[in-house]
Amino acid sequence: MVKRLTDEDRHAALRELPGWSAAEGREAIARTFVFKDFNEAFGFMARVALIAEKHDHHPEWRNVYKTVEVVLTTHDAGGVTARDIDLARAMNAIAAQLSPR
């Protein structure tokens, strides 16, 4: 099982993840991505889904038109792990390629 990050490690990781913050009221990190339109938002989700499936680590997310709200946590560990940080980095890289606002 993957080990949950300490508070200090989680805060340090968040400093290196633009747009991400601690999720309110739970042991998780969150970010809202805003894209040009629905097609771009859905394209982002499709690309992330491929990575998530490959690593067997799936986000909690919600899509409304051009907005994708994401929450990452590792349920088995009861909080944020390196797997969440890695997926957040991948999401930021994909979003940067698609030029979100």
Swiss-Prot record:
Kindly provide the name given to this protein in its UniProt entry: Putative pterin-4-alpha-carbinolamine dehydratase
Lyase as a keyword? yes
Q: Which CDD domains match?
A: PCD_DCoH_subfamily_b (cd00914)
Q: What class of enzyme is it?
A: lyase
Q: Which UniProt keywords apply?
A: Lyase
Q: Which family does it belong to?
A: Belongs to the pterin-4-alpha-carbinolamine dehydratase family.
| Gene Ontology terms: biological process | tetrahydrobiopterin biosynthetic process
Listed under catalytic activity are: (4aS,6R)-4a-hydroxy-L-erythro-5,6,7,8-tetrahydrobiopterin = (6R)-L-erythro-6,7-dihydrobiopterin + H2O
* GO molecular function annotations of the record: 4-alpha-hydroxytetrahydrobiopterin dehydratase activity
Q: What is its EC number?
A: 4.2.1.96
